[in-house]
């Protein structure tokens, strides 16, 4: 755990209130239960468009559970139920009649551990496109190239698209998973500790990529690494025991937290 606050490289300035900006997503009074375990307790958060929001907090605080709730991934877990609203484009997607396939197309997700398909590099990106009905080979190839370029991977793999994705390094596999997600042209990307299993060089590439991707997508990232949150995010939400303790601009939260629990956590006094 850090013993000092993460350094903020920019001059402290007031970040616009997230509620004053156009919202890509929001939750209102969101609760998540695993059986009798009340994992998320009435969370209200708003995620501004084309910004990066980091979710931080100690292990077991609920941040990954909350992230998975945003595109209904928790529906795959037996005994899990959710109450409250998950608003995407102003529509509550926490309803039984919602098409989850389309939800996850619009709200893409990249997991902590790279999980490429046991297919070629090309097929990893093209698979979802074909499944959604794209048939023109030229159009598919154009989308594959565009997605790999956006994931800063094209120059490294353009001559090896037929090779197995499993032959790539861990960092390359994670960028391939990001390319696979952006190929579906989502509006929101959910990143669950995308660099935690990577070496420092690969981590740096992922962070640079996040800063590029926010020009096209709204990004919500879970991270245990507070230095990383400080480097890549515009807004930060501190979770503790399934609740949001504080949510503000990243520079404000790390340099002038308003809650003692936040101050204690970023100073390394607990968590």
Curated annotation (Swiss-Prot):
It comes from Listeria innocua serovar 6a (strain ATCC BAA-680 / CLIP 11262). One of its GO terms (cellular component) is plasma membrane. Keywords: ATP-binding, Cell membrane, Membrane, Nucleotide-binding, Phosphate transport, Translocase, Transport. It is an enzyme of class 7 (translocase). It is a peripheral membrane protein. ATP binds at residues 57-64. Part of the ABC transporter complex PstSACB involved in phosphate import. Responsible for energy coupling to the transport system. The complex is composed of two ATP-binding proteins (PstB), two transmembrane proteins (PstC and PstA) and a solute-binding protein (PstS). PROSITE patterns: ABC_TRANSPORTER_1 (PS00211), ABC_TRANSPORTER_2 (PS50893), PSTB (PS51238). The keyword Phosphoprotein does not apply. It comes from the Bacteria. It is found in: Cell membrane. It catalyses: phosphate(out) + ATP + H2O = ADP + 2 phosphate(in) + H(+). This is Phosphate import ATP-binding protein PstB 2. GO terms for biological process: phosphate ion transmembrane transport. CDD domains: ABC_PstB_phosphate_transporter. Its EC number is 7.3.2.1. Belongs to the ABC transporter superfamily. Phosphate importer (TC 3.A.1.7) family. Residues 1-20 are annotated as: Disordered. One of its GO terms (molecular function) is ATPase-coupled phosphate ion transmembrane transporter activity. The keyword Translocase applies. Residues 25-266 form the ABC transporter domain.
């Amino acid at each position: 755990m850090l013993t000092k606050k993460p350094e903020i490289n920019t001059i402290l300035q007031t970040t616009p209130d997230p509620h004053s900006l156009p919202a890509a997503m929001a939750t209102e009074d969101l609760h998540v239960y695993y059986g009798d375990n009340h994992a998320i307790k009435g969370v209200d958060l708003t995620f501004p468009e084309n910004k990066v929001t980091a979710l931080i907090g100690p292990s077991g605080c609920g941040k990954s559970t909350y992230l998975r709730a945003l595109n209904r991934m928790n529906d795959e877990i037996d005994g899990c139920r959710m109450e409250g609203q998950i608003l995407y484009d102003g529509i509550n997607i926490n309803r039984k009649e919602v098409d989850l396939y389309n939800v996850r197309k619009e709200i893409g997700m990249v997991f902590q551990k790279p999980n490429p398909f046991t297919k070629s590099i090309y097929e990893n990106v093209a698979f979802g496109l074909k499944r959604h009905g794209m048939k023109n080979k030229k159009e598919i190839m154009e989308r594959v190239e565009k997605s790999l370029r956006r994931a800063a991977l094209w120059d490294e793999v353009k001559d090896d698209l037929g090779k197995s994705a499993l032959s790539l390094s861990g960092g390359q596999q994670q960028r391939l998973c990001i390319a696979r997600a952006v190929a579906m042209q989502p509006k929101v990307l959910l990143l669950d500790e995308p660099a935690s299993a990577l070496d420092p060089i690969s981590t740096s590439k992922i962070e640079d990529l996040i800063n590029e991707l926010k020009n096209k997508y709204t990004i919500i990232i879970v991270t245990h690494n507070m230095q990383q949150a400080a480097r890549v995010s515009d807004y930060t939400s501190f979770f503790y025991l399934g609740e949001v303790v504080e949510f503000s601009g990243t520079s404000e939260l790390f340099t002038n937290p308003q809650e003692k629990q936040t101050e204690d956590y970023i100073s390394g006094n607990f968590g």
